[in-house]
C-alpha cells in the first residue's frame, strides 16, 4: 500500500507561532537558510513589478535551491469564473492543451487545482508513491509520456478565492518531492499569490484600440473547425503562438459542454500583452460543438473581477462605477449621498490600490 500523500497547513509557516513545536518537517525547513532566503526572494519578486515571463524565470531561480526542479508553470485564474487567464512556463508539457483540460475538468485525479484550493493544504505531489497514484491519469498518461515522473502543485489562494497555481516538474530518474520541500513551497504561497494578482491586472503603457469581436467554433475533438480573423488577432495578443488553441478556449468549451458552472459567471477576463481587456465566453451550439466568443470586456463585466483583484470595498466600487460612467466628483457625491471630501478619500484609496495618480490614469488602468 502506498504511503499517505503530503498534507501541509495552508499558512505562511515562517509566521506561524506553533510550527516549531508541532511540525518537525516545518521546523527543519524554517531553520534552513536556503528556505528562508527563498521566501525573502519571492517576497521581493512580488513587489518588483516584473513582466510575467521574467517573474516566472526569477521565481524558478529563487526556488531552485530549496525545491529543485527541471520545469515550472505559473498560472493565473479569473477570480470569479475560475477560468485560466495567463501562463508562463519553461521545460514543461508540450503539445495541445486539450488533454490537460480534460484531466483538470472532467477526470477524477489527485490534486486538481480546484480541489487543492478547497483543502486544508494547498500543496500536493505526484510521483512519490502516495495512495491512489497508481490510478492517476495525469501521472501515467500525461507526465510520464512526456518524460516527467514527479510533480508538485501549489494552489495560490486566500480565503475562498483561487488566484493562480504553481507547478514544478522533475524528469524521470529524479527523486520525489519531499515533505520538507512541500513545506518550503507552501511558505512562499502568500507573496506569490500577491504577485499573481498584480500580474493579472498590470498595465504597461497605453493600450491600443480594442479589436472587433471574434468567434471560434470548437469541434467534438477539441480542434478549431473555424476561427475568425478577429479571434486569431485576439489570440496573438495573449496566447503562445505554437498552441493550436489557447488553454482557456478549450477550458471554456469544456465547461459549456458539461454545464459546469451553469448559471454562474463563466467569463474569462484577460489582460492581454498589449494592455487590452479581453472577455472570453463559450456557449454550446449542439451536443458536440461550442462557440467561443472573444471581444472587448465591458466595464460591467470587469468590475466584479477588478474588485476581487484589487480588494475594493463595496463603497469604493460604487464610486469607481460612477467615475467610469463619466460622473464628476460632485455628481458622485450627490448620487451616493456622500460629501465631496469623502468621495475624494475613496478616490485616493483607489489610486493607491491601483498604483495610479489621477482620474485619467485610473480609468486607463481599468479599461
Predicted regions and their residues:
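Short amphipathic alpha-helical boundary/capping segments
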Residues: 304-312
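Short helix-to-turn junction characteristic of helix-turn-helix DNA-binding domains
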Residues: 323-327, 366
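Regulatory input/activation interfaces that engage signals or partners
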Residues: 33-180, 184, 190-198
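PAS-family sensory/regulatory modules and their coupling/dimerization elements
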Residues: 251-299
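Short alpha-helical interdomain "coupling" segment at the junction between an upstream regulatory sensor module
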Residues: 196-210
Amino acid at each position: 500500500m502506498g504511503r499517505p500523500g503530503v498534507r501541509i497547513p495552508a499558512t505562511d509557516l515562517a509566521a506561524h507561532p506553533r510550527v516549531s513545536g508541532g511540525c518537525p518537517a516545518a521546523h527543519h525547513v524554517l531553520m534552513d537558510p536556503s528556505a528562508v532566503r527563498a521566501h525573502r526572494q519571492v517576497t521581493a519578486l512580488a513587489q518588483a513589478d516584473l513582466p510575467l515571463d521574467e517573474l516566472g524565470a526569477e521565481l524558478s531561480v529563487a526556488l531552485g535551491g530549496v525545491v529543485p526542479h527541471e520545469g515550472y508553470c505559473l498560472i493565473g485564474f479569473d477570480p470569479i469564473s475560475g477560468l485560466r487567464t495567463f501562463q508562463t512556463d519553461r521545460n514543461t508539457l508540450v503539445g495541445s492543451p486539450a488533454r490537460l483540460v480534460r484531466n483538470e475538468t472532467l477526470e477524477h485525479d489527485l490534486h486538481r487545482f480546484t480541489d487543492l484550493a478547497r483543502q486544508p493544504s494547498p500543496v500536493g505531489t505526484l510521483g512519490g508513491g502516495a495512495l491512489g497514484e497508481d490510478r492517476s491519469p495525469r501521472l501515467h498518461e500525461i507526465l510520464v509520456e512526456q518524460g516527467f515522473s514527479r510533480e508538485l502543485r501549489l494552489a495560490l489562494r486566500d480565503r475562498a478565492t483561487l488566484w493562480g497555481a504553481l507547478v514544478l516538474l522533475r524528469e524521470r530518474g529524479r527523486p520525489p518531492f519531499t515533505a520538507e520541500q512541500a513545506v518550503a513551497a507552501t511558505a512562499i504561497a502568500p507573496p506569490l499569490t500577491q504577485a499573481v494578482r498584480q500580474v493579472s491586472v498590470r498595465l504597461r503603457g497605453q493600450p491600443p484600440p480594442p479589436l472587433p469581436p471574434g468567434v471560434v467554433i470548437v469541434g467534438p475533438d477539441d480542434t478549431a473547425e473555424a476561427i475568425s480573423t478577429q479571434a486569431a488577432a485576439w489570440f496573438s495578443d495573449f496566447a503562445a503562438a505554437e498552441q493550436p488553441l489557447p488553454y482557456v478556449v478549450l477550458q471554456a468549451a469544456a465547461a459549456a459542454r458539461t454545464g459546469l458552472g451553469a448559471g454562474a459567471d463563466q467569463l474569462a477576463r484577460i489582460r492581454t500583452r498589449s494592455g487590452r481587456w479581453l472577455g472570453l465566453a463559450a456557449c454550446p451550439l449542439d451536443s458536440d460543438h461550442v462557440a467561443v466568443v472573444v471581444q472587448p470586456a465591458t466595464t460591467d463585466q470587469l468590475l466584479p473581477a477588478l474588485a476581487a483583484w484589487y480588494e475594493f470595498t463595496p463603497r469604493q466600487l460604487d464610486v469607481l462605477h460612477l467615475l467610469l460612467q463619466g460622473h464628476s466628483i460632485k455628481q458622485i457625491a450627490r448620487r451616493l449621498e456622500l460629501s465631496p471630501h469623502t468621495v475624494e478619500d475613496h478616490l485616493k484609496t483607489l489610486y493607491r490600490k491601483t498604483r495610479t495618480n489621477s482620474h485619467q490614469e485610473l480609468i486607463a488602468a481599468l479599461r
